[in-house]
């Protein structure tokens, strides 16, 4: 039986050795798998961090571009407000001229605008009170000197304009208010005004 025991012992030893070798091989393979997984995880982590950094840079660029755009918009808006104010002040200055000077400007504008000489002049309520009694008569004289039949009349009607006048011929009204003239001329002169202001 000693021979059987030896065989048994030998089989057990070989089985143990085989098991240990298998365990060792499995542990080595597991260690390799873990190492590769760790390397892969580190690489993915680096990729994710790099991507996050790039996204942060992109977000920063976008935010900067948006801030610059907003600053340009505000600057443009401020410029526009200054330009608007300049044009509004022009209207205010015209309206605040001394009555005689104001009347002369309006008179000249009317003479230059009249075509038939029989139009009606519509003023603002304020200007209607402001003009002298001989205002229309003076305009008609100037028209006659230009060879135009001077039969201009001051309308009973008034319009809500800050200054200037409305020239009415039948059903047609031509707006010669300061606001309308400035609005029409603004495009032509705005670039020069901006250049002068800035």
Curated annotation (Swiss-Prot):
The gene is atpE. Keywords: ATP synthesis, Hydrogen ion transport, Ion transport, Transport. It comes from the Bacteria. GO terms for biological process: proton motive force-driven plasma membrane ATP synthesis. InterPro entries: ATPase_E_C, ATPase_V1_Esu. Gene3D superfamilies: ATP synthase, E subunit, C-terminal, F1F0 ATP synthase subunit B, membrane domain. This is V-type ATP synthase subunit E. SUPFAM superfamilies: V-type ATPase subunit E-like. Transmembrane segments: none annotated. GO terms for molecular function: ATP binding; proton-transporting ATP synthase activity, rotational mechanism; proton-transporting ATPase activity, rotational mechanism. GO terms for cellular component: proton-transporting two-sector ATPase complex, catalytic domain.
